[in-house]
Curated annotation (Swiss-Prot):
Keyword line: Aminoacyl-tRNA synthetase, ATP-binding, Cytoplasm, Ligase, Magnesium, Metal-binding, Nucleotide-binding, Protein biosynthesis
Cofactor section: Mg(2+)
Residues the record lists as binding Mg(2+): 409
Protein name per UniProt: Phenylalanine--tRNA ligase alpha subunit
Organism: Methanocaldococcus jannaschii (strain ATCC 43067 / DSM 2661 / JAL-1 / JCM 10045 / NBRC 100440) (Methanococcus jannaschii)
Family named by the database record: Belongs to the class-II aminoacyl-tRNA synthetase family. Phe-tRNA synthetase alpha subunit type 2 subfamily.
Reaction(s) catalysed (UniProt annotation): tRNA(Phe) + L-phenylalanine + ATP = L-phenylalanyl-tRNA(Phe) + AMP + diphosphate + H(+)
GO cellular component: cytoplasm
Keyword GTP-binding: no
Cellular compartments annotated: Cytoplasm
């Protein structure tokens, strides 16, 4: 049987002392306590020893000063008198000890209390409580006292002289297999557990026993510093899109309704623009917008939606509700020459919705938006790009179904298949409507899509509540 050198040392203690069992505190003179516990656990796994734990009640001395009744007797003895008026006890004892002294005198019968006086017949009386306190100094285990003594110990506890505590007694015993094992000589030879340069050069390794490593032994998990799970997904998506040839763009968090809604052909009376869905800035409450572009967008809205376009609504400042505003800003910034070139851009950033917080909604979350502009791109190209993107994210089964979005036509939703959960919606996409592109002078088709990171993170980490993604649960953050 392969034994560690410390296992051999512990078993040799049993062998040298011709004993089958030891208390832990007895073994501590041979080996440190922590090592004994660790080695005995190894030997227990090999069925060579067994351990037995017993919890013992111990008595702790809280104070060792004289009883107040003994203080009275000693005072009288010093003054060669045998009685004292109760009202004069304040000269001998603190106020809080007087009642305790009177109660003890009555209970023990060591003096008489008559006509407001305490009268002692014997100032050198014997007190079993004092004798027991002395015994407790020499023996702390409650089980070693008689039932009568335990009653007195309870009195001492009430008087605040002692208290109880618990102590574990651990016994390490040889099993039958262990007893058989120590019948044979146990040799403690030099053992090398870690090869060093000096050991190799000196040649010590030739004569010593080199302990083999068990690579299957469980080890304590190590939790190094980690990036937050949501940040990891954002970085992963960014790397995938950059590898697919996209360029990252940014736009402001605070937007005008013009860039967030009007430019995307969303009518000004659309429900999504109401207070319950959008955060409006109180101050400043209006922003600047390009007047020439405003007039073009106004003309498209009034011609197609048949309503009176309000320019003041367009100037209102809000927290952006989607990152599509980044895409449309990018397209509007292109020069005539740049409009003739293909473009692939994406934006990953925070968006805001005025929604009640629950298991699947937060007022602030991350979104990814991407567009592709080229002469010959079509709906099939959009499906192909999205399928490749989702495959790279680790979703093998992907399917698409028709959908409706105000600023794309045709539109679709992508679903991914997860074992045990079935098909789940993950992103929306489509081709920008001509009414979106007309005011900025773009005639080429533009493919667009968007994905929410919160939903993606929930799928990736198996969460059922989106709020868990933002909790300070260190155990979960260490594991994922």
């Amino acid at each position: 049987m392969e034994l560690h050198i410390d296992e051999k040392r512990l078993l040799k203690i049993f062998q040298d002392n011709n004993r089958d069992e030891f208390n832990l505190n007895e073994l501590e003179k041979f080996m440190p306590k922590e090592k004994i516990l660790r080695v005995s656990l190894w030997l227990k796994g090999k069925n060579l020893v067994e351990t037995e734990e017993k919890v013992k009640k111990i008595i702790k001395l809280i104070k060792e000063e004289e009883f107040p009744e003994r203080k009275i007797a000693n005072y009288l003895k010093q003054h060669n008198i045998k009685e004292i008026e109760i009202k004069n006890l304040k000269d001998i004892l603190p106020k809080e000890e007087i009642n305790a002294a009177l109660g003890a005198i009555k209970r023990k019968g060591i003096a008489r209390i008559e006509k407001g006086k305490i009268i002692f017949d014997n100032l050198d009386y014997k007190d079993v409580e004092e004798q027991l306190l002395q015994k407790i100094k020499e023996n702390k285990y409650l089980d070693d006292f008689s039932e009568e003594e335990k009653k007195i110990i309870d009195i001492l506890k009430k008087r605040g002289y002692v208290d109880f505590d618990e102590e574990k007694e651990i016994k390490i015993k040889l099993t039958e297999k262990g007893k058989e094992f120590i019948k044979n000589p146990i040799e403690i030879e030099e053992e090398i557990t870690q090869l060093t340069r000096d050991i190799i050069i000196s040649g010590k390794w030739k004569k010593a026993y080199i302990r083999p490593y068990d690579v299957k032994v469980p080890t304590k998990p190590i939790y190094p510093a980690k990036v937050h799970p949501l940040t990891r997904i954002i970085r992963e998506v960014k790397e995938i899109l950059l590898a697919m040839g996209f360029k990252e763009v940014k736009s402001p968090i605070v937007e005008t309704e013009f860039w967030n809604f009007d430019m995307l052909f969303e009518p000004q009376d659309h429900p999504a623009r109401e207070m319950q869905d959008t955060f409006f800035l109180k101050y400043p409450n209006e922003g600047d917008i390009p007047e020439d572009l405003l007039s073009k967008v106004k003309e498209v809205h009034e011609r197609c939606w048949k309503y009176k376009f309000d320019e003041n609504v367009s100037r209102r400042l809000i927290l952006r509700t989607h990152t599509t505003a980044s895409s449309i800003r990018y397209l509007a910034s292109l020069s005539d020459e740049e409009k003739n070139k293909p473009h692939k851009v994406f934006c990953i950033d925070r968006v805001f919705r005025n929604e009640a917080i629950d298991y699947k909604h937060l007022p602030e979350f991350y979104q990814c938006e991407g567009i592709i502009m080229d002469d010959n791109v079509n709906f099939n190209n959009l499906i192909g790009v999205l399928k490749e993107f989702l495959n790279r994210l680790g979703f093998e089964k992907v399917r698409f179904r028709p959908a409706y979005f105000p600023f794309t036509e045709p539109s679709l939703e992508a679903e991914v298949y997860l074992e045990g959960k079935g098909w789940l919606e993950i992103l929306g996409a489509g081709i920008f409507r001509p009414e979106v592109l007309e005011p900025i002078g773009i005639e080429k088709p533009v493919l667009a899509w968007g994905i929410g990171f919160s939903r993606l993170a929930m799928l990736r980490y198996g969460l059922t509540d989106i709020r868990d993604l933002h909790k300070n649960d260190l155990d979960w953050l260490k594991r994922v």
